Amino acid sequence: MSAAANAEHGAADRVEILPVPGLPEFRPGDDLVGSLAEAAPWLRDGDVLVVTSKVVSKCEGRIVAAPSDPEERDTLRRKLIDDEAVRVLARKGRTLITENAIGLVQAAAGVDGSNVGSTELALLPVDPDRSAATLREGLRERLGVTVGVVITDTMGRAWRTGQTDFAIGASGLTVLQGYAGSRDRHGNELVVTEVAVADEIAAAADLVKGKLTAIPVAVVRGLRLPDDGSTAHRLVRAGEDDLFWLGTAEAIELGRRQAQLLRRSVRRFSAEPVPHDAIEAAVGEALTAPAPHHTRPVRFVWVQDSETRTRLLDRMKEQWRADLTADGLDADAVDRRVARGQILYDAPELVIPFLVPDGAHSYPDDARTAAEHTMFTVAVGAAVQGLLVALAVRDIGSCWIGSTIFAADLVRAELELPDDWEPLGAIAIGYPEQTPQPLGPRDPVPTDELLVRK
């Protein structure tokens, strides 16, 4: 039966939470089903048996011998956390928030030293859903009853202080009740409501089980939850769907590492306008690039007037066409080369970087004068790269085109700029045209022959 067949997970009636007292201190290899059948012969069809994962771990042999010395015990605990975790989401002090092999996100990969001997540590069950199914089938054979089973562990919750019990294993019930398409009593359609029923049961049962009561098992009675074949694994949100895939500090660190790799040359733009404050902010960040002699060797000219842009690009195209024709290229080849500049017409915004020699040192010889000019050119290049990256981290595309370098006098004349301002290309800016798959960070380039060591 599907979850949709059950219109409401709430009982709208009396629900009981019953303790299961008299259970022994479990050890590896103990018969958990037999102990439960003996302690709770009163189980009925439809009951939900809620079992603390520590009990399952003990019976399944997920107990590790540990030193009694606190420091040595903590060292082992941290090694076990590393072994159990597949990734670390966040760190705060010595606390690690991890994901384990079955996708559970919690502190310390579920490695725990509570409710075990002082020379032991407990690991989570390897497959809690399978453990739940085994318990359910065993009780059906021993007592002739059909129950649901939820295996629980204690975790914290995003946005909330404190911990509560969650379902990490389940069998024989609806673990997730969807209400999308249903209507409330006022006729309002429920759009995204989806209730983690198994988690609600886990939390409710903990009101009876507690932490210090020596009651590791409780029974929730009075719910009407059909077995839709789902398990607790369905409650695990995969990393790619998780809005909190990393902790804050880790997300910031990842963003810093990936910022450079987000930049790529975008040649097709959408018509969506780019907010002016975003461009201003990106330029401000770009201007923090290193520069010689504490100077400001770069100016970014933002060509905002459409008539000015068209006139400038038309004149550059005419000169470029004349130069290529003089080189002996045929008309088709000239057209193909000139067409590459169409991006500067089409981009929503156009910014031209200029080298400005303010503060450059003067030298009596050509060699040092040329070196000074090269130094300023490198500084402008650093600022240009900074601008491209600053745009990319805002999801704004860009493409650096070198054409203005070949028409410096023309560019200065059209934009009415001083004679010592040197254009160093042009930057087309805009939001990238939609693609079937969003473009993520690029892979770093192999350094095999490009990083020379001496």
Curated annotation (Swiss-Prot):
InterPro entries: F420-0_g-glutamyl_ligase (IPR008225), F420-0_gamma-glut_ligase-dom (IPR002847), F420_FbiB_C (IPR019943), FbiB (IPR023661), Nitroreductase (IPR029479), Nitroreductase-like (IPR000415). Its cofactor is Mg(2+); Mn(2+); K(+). Keywords: GTP-binding, Ligase, Magnesium, Manganese, Metal-binding, Multifunctional enzyme, Nucleotide-binding, Oxidoreductase, Potassium. Residues 248-454 are annotated as: Dehydro-coenzyme F420-0 reductase. The keyword Mitochondrion does not apply. Residues 1-247 are annotated as: Coenzyme F420:L-glutamate ligase. Its EC number is 6.3.2.31, 6.3.2.34, 1.3.8.17. Binds 2 divalent metal cations per subunit. The ions could be magnesium and/or manganese. Monovalent cation. The ion could be potassium. It comes from the Bacteria. Residues 432-454 are annotated as: Disordered. It catalyses: oxidized coenzyme F420-0 + GTP + L-glutamate = oxidized coenzyme F420-1 + GDP + phosphate + H(+); oxidized coenzyme F420-1 + GTP + L-glutamate = oxidized coenzyme F420-2 + GDP + phosphate + H(+); oxidized coenzyme F420-(gamma-L-Glu)(n) + GTP + L-glutamate = oxidized coenzyme F420-(gamma-L-Glu)(n+1) + GDP + phosphate + H(+); oxidized coenzyme F420-0 + FMN + H(+) = dehydro coenzyme F420-0 + FMNH2. It holds the Pfam family F420_ligase. In the N-terminal section; belongs to the CofE family. Bifunctional enzyme that catalyzes the GTP-dependent successive addition of two or more gamma-linked L-glutamates to the L-lactyl phosphodiester of 7,8-didemethyl-8-hydroxy-5-deazariboflavin (F420-0) to form polyglutamated F420 derivatives, and the FMNH2-dependent reduction of dehydro-F420-0 to form F420-0. Is able to add up to six glutamates to F420-0, producing F420-3 as the major product with lesser amount of F420-4,5,6, consistent with it producing the polyglutamated F420 compounds present in Mycobacterium smegmatis. PANTHER family: COENZYME F420:L-GLUTAMATE LIGASE, PTHR47917. NCBIfam families: F420_cofE, F420_FbiB_CTERM, PRK13294.1. This is Bifunctional F420 biosynthesis protein FbiB. The lineage of its organism: Bacteria, Bacillati, Actinomycetota, Actinomycetes, Mycobacteriales. The gene is fbiB.
